Regions:
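N-terminal secretory/targeting leader peptides
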Residues: 1-24, 41-191
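Signature of the catalytic double-stranded beta-helix
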Residues: 26-39
Length: 191
């Protein structure tokens, strides 16, 4: 996670888009001379055929009081689900394990001072109602990888493999366009 944060209204500013994050991850996984072979080796050992990464959600930090940098978050009770805690602890934050379903109440009651969630959760759960500030980290979160069982992949003909690969590429292209050009502007208006 990048240490740079930006105000919520600058969601698409300075090249911070969901598609850019996915492009970087796919480069690391599929093209970079140092990392790609290691990741491919790991996938083979796990018995999976990776297609690539799919769009994730922006990580938004919702705070009960003003915050404009990651430094501003230090010393505050920082709510995050358990699976993301180690990343924020490594950044020197005072992590309080809190599931997303409990975020609104935890923020409202002061159990946590800040909470990190995907922008879709911040929007749908109206976490911004509890906040004096919302920061969007300059990285996406919740990004997953699209993969298939390697044995099943090997059973497919070359033509079938090509169809799966093209379908993945078309889907990611559609997702990136929809996320960057439809969903983010809609969230900006709501939040």
């Amino acid at each position: 996670i990048a240490s740079q944060v930006m105000p919520l209204w600058q969601i698409g500013a300075n090249g911070h888009t969901a598609s850019k994050g996915v492009d970087i991850l796919n480069y690391i996984a599929n093209e970079d001379e140092k990392t790609s072979p290691l990741l491919q080796e790991e996938a083979t050992a796990a018995g999976v055929h990776p297609f690539g990464y799919n769009i994730g959600d922006y990580n938004v930090v919702v705070c009960r009081s003003e915050a404009s940098t990651m430094e501003d978050l230090k010393g505050r009770a920082f709510g995050i689900p358990a699976q993301g805690a180690a990343v924020y602890e490594a950044m020197g934050l005072n992590v309080v394990t809190c599931e997303t379903a409990d975020a609104y109440e935890s923020l409202s009651r002061g159990v946590v001072d800040c909470f990190a969630a995907g922008i879709s959760s911040v929007s749908s759960m109206k976490l911004y109602e509890t906040a004096k500030s919302c920061l969007v980290l300059s990285a996406t979160g919740g990004t997953g990888i699209c993969m298939m069982n390697e044995a099943s992949w090997e059973k497919l003909s070359e033509e079938q493999q090509k169809i799966f690969t093209e379908a993945y590429n078309e889907t990611i292209s559609w997702m990136k366009d929809r996320y960057d050009n439809e969903l983010l502007p809609a969230y900006e208006k709501e939040i």
